[in-house]
Amino acid sequence: WIIPFVPLPVPMLIGVGLLLFPIXTNKLRRMWAFPSILLLSIVMIFSTNLSIQQINSNSIYQYVWSWTLDNDFSLELGCLIDPLTSIMSMLITIVGITVLIYSDNYMAHDQGYLRFFAYMSFFSTSMLGLVTSSNLIQIYIFWELVGVCSYLLIGFWFTRPLAANACQKAFVTNRVGDFGLLLGILGFYWITGSFEFRDLFEIFNNLIVNNQVNYLFVTLCAALLFAGAVAKSAQFPLHVWLPDAMEGPTPISALIHAATMVAEGIFLVARLLPLFIVIPYIMNFISLIGIITVLLGATLALAQKDIKRGLAYSTMSQLGYMMLALGMGSYRSALFHLITHAYSKALLFLGSGSVIHSMETIVGYSPEKSQNMVLMGGLRKYVPITKISFLLGTLSLCGIPPLACFWSKDEILNDSWLYSPIFAIIAWATAGLTAFYMFRIYLLTFEGHLNVYFQNYSGKKNTAFYSISIWGKGCSKRINKNFRLLRINNQSSSFFLKKTYRSDENLKKRNGGRPFINLIRFENKKARLYPYESDNTMLFPLLILVLFTLFVGYLGISFNQEARDLDILSKWLAPSIDLLHQKSRDLTDWYEFLKDAIFSVSIAYFGILLASLLYKPIFASFKNFDLINSFVKTGPKRSRWDKILTLLYNWSHNRAYIDVFYTTSFTGSIRGLSQLTHFFDTQVIDGITNGVGVMSFFV
């Protein structure tokens, strides 16, 4: 029970220090990274010990404090330690520690350094409290606390209008899901009379067996519970907050998209799976939402120019795979993919942060420029360690063996054939799209030449950028008109440009290299002509996550053909429900696995090959810019191809028009209603009052 509260002293002490000793606390601000990392490391040791106990004994530990208010009602609080809890605790602590170490250097220049670490530690506390909750009331309390922390971190740079709007958007979107979650919790309490998971599952199963419940009402309550997971895990149609959440600092993006906020929805569905399994319509609904999100996220990622938004849509698609697996009843595959994806995606986000950090020395603090992949390119020469790390994370997400995501995604793809051939075809096709858009991000960022110095060529004939679109080396003028980010004014300033600091370079010279931890004063960030590799404090977490990306997939591999349950993950999840694997247990062997693996890897390589053809280095030869435009030929086939590209580009660029629909329908109608209410209040209500007052003069 002490696990959630171990990181809590850090935000409390920072708050007290800023209140009582603000000057001293700010002077020693870099000191607070150490206790944050230390306390989370202690939690990681506890979580590792619990995980080992789970693997060895398959025990489930529950401790409950009961507070009896009267004979009819008692409030129970407690902690539940089972395989799901231990898996999530390990994820939160390991990813959290790497992000905290990384943030010490990444946020060193920021005036909100102390506030950042206070939020991060409280975020870890809230998430650990959520995964150890033993009842729905505790789940809801910590659910809201995690939401509060994520809103604070998304809007961390709240003076930027985009960040403030993104924070509000995330808040409003999640309010919809959270309200549904609350109604669902109250509905199941009305049905069963209990909030405790064990009692809830047992009572509900008995009611279903004895046919003592209204199936329509039960389905409605389950759908409301699922609405909370849909919003938090950015599933269709409540996914619209996710790309805007990229306005927060990059370490926050890594934490939110790897192990915390977006994992909440998957955790909730996994925790309540015994409840959902006895309601077939809900399981079908979960898998339907999952497969829609898989395809939608992949198509929206195809033409993103912002490196973080591209990774955000990738996260959305991968979460769809997990939700699809849960809807199919493949509990083990869903959690396996949650584990492997967390480390790979954290690696990708921290790698992108390293790239952004190095680009800021050239373009200044301007997210529109420093995160724009069109202005990158050729970074493999300047940031080699980051490049290798990012490439490994990319290949893992593409599903290339023997990296982590290959093993888990392959399980989900194979299970989808047992569930529905239509869903399987969509899932396999999206695997190819995943390889395409992930390798596109890698090629635009690291291959070719540094494009930031060629932005003056854009939009004019007979120049390199005339026929360069976000789709690769060539396209029609029609697409180029939409390509606004190529025409960025290089002289535009940002609010934060004058408030950006950099560690003292002299200490690096005295130490003979990059310092591992900088406890020094700060000065203005110096402009450079070319990017440079990040400090060791930022590279060390990348190397740790590379190791997990390489080896964590072996948790779920069974090296014995006769028994599937000899792998570590199956022992870990022994008491859990896994419907599809019970059906397919006898069919699973190395021959079947190799046959499916060869097919999935072939699809992934096809996506990589297509991305390489479209996005291979554009400036391989500068001798004749007209050569780049030479393949743009007129004709019916080319015209048809341009129309398809334009359609796909507009679909991705406009976010499938879902944001536009929400803005015109919901936002517009609410504003219209508010204006009507305002008119009625000022003209009618106030008019009656004022009219009576005026009439009194004539009476």
Swiss-Prot record:
> Which top EC class is named for this enzyme in its record?
translocase
Q: Pfam families, from UniProt?
A: Proton_antipo_C, Proton_antipo_M, Proton_antipo_N
Localization per record: Plastid, Chloroplast thylakoid membrane
| Biological processes per GO annotation | ATP synthesis coupled electron transport; electron transport coupled proton transport
The membrane-spanning stretches of this chain are 1-21, 32-52, 81-101, 117-137, 139-159, 177-197, 216-236, 250-270, 272-292, 319-339, 346-366, 388-408, 417-437, 539-559, 598-618
Please give the Gene Ontology molecular function terms for this protein.
NADH dehydrogenase (ubiquinone) activity; quinone binding
* Cellular-component GO terms for this entry: chloroplast thylakoid membrane
Membrane topology for this entry? Answer: Multi-pass membrane protein
Q: Which UniProt keywords apply?
A: Chloroplast, Membrane, NAD, NADP, Plastid, Plastoquinone, Quinone, Thylakoid, Translocase, Transmembrane, Transmembrane helix, Transport
EC number annotated for this UniProt entry: 7.1.1.-
Q: Which reaction does it catalyse?
A: a plastoquinone + NADH + (n+1) H(+)(in) = a plastoquinol + NAD(+) + n H(+)(out); a plastoquinone + NADPH + (n+1) H(+)(in) = a plastoquinol + NADP(+) + n H(+)(out)
- Subunit: NDH is composed of at least 16 different subunits, 5 of which are encoded in the nucleus.
Cited function: NDH shuttles electrons from NAD(P)H:plastoquinone, via FMN and iron-sulfur (Fe-S) centers, to quinones in the photosynthetic chain and possibly in a chloroplast respiratory chain. The immediate electron acceptor for the enzyme in this species is believed to be plastoquinone. Couples the redox reaction to proton translocation, and thus conserves the redox energy in a proton gradient.
Entry similarity comment: Belongs to the complex I subunit 5 family.
> NCBIfam families, from UniProt?
NDH_I_L (TIGR01974), PRK06590.1 (NF005141)
List, alphabetically, the PANTHER family matched. NADH-UBIQUINONE OXIDOREDUCTASE CHAIN 5 (PTHR42829:SF2)
Q: What is this protein called?
A: NAD(P)H-quinone oxidoreductase subunit 5, chloroplastic
